[in-house]
Amino acid sequence: MSTIDPIRYPIGTFQAPAQFRAEDVKEWIAAIRELPDALRAAVAGLNDEQLNTPYRDGGWTVAQVVHHLADASMNAFLRTKWGLTEDKPAIKPFEESEWAKTADARSLPIEPSLMLLEGLHVRWATLLESMTEADFQRLICPEGAKQAMPLYVLTALYTWHGKHHTAQIMSLRKRKGW
């Protein structure tokens, strides 16, 4: 029996919802709308040395996590748009570990990514609020996945994803006494 590493997965692993539930979608949209503020609070007051500290041994730095959340949110927003405007679009994954090595993720201050998240999440939440149940049932086809994914599952996944990485930062702060 394997155990989940609580430092890597402080809120547990993603559990896909089995079915569409409007009340879940409302909660996910609220969480997506609130993520930029939650993330900004999680990094508030951290200095450059702290921002350049890995959240775990072998993990990304806090700054890389912030930049990754901007990258992932852009991808999620575009995947949602493709799912709404195309018939079962093929979704190319992005190489997260490689993106985290790029110059912007390694050396840029976090403020541009925080600002990007603020604007993007307003647009994304507004788009999600406009969607019907039929829209949320539309499918995307992630490359390499065993089956197509409905947009409601994509929304749940990225809700978890934002909370997951914010919790990693908060866990590091607690462990370090920051």
UniProtKB/Swiss-Prot annotation:
GO terms for molecular function: hydrolase activity; zinc ion binding. Binds 1 zinc ion per subunit. Its cofactor is Zn(2+). Pfam families: DinB_2 (PF12867). Disulfide bonds: none annotated. It is found in: Cytoplasm. It is an enzyme of class 3 (hydrolase). Keywords: Cytoplasm, Hydrolase, Metal-binding, Zinc. Zn(2+) binds at H68, H161, H165. One of its GO terms (cellular component) is cytoplasm. Its EC number is 3.-.-.-. Belongs to the metal hydrolase YfiT family. Homodimer. Possible metal-dependent hydrolase. NCBIfam families: PRK13291.1. This is Putative metal-dependent hydrolase GTNG_0529.
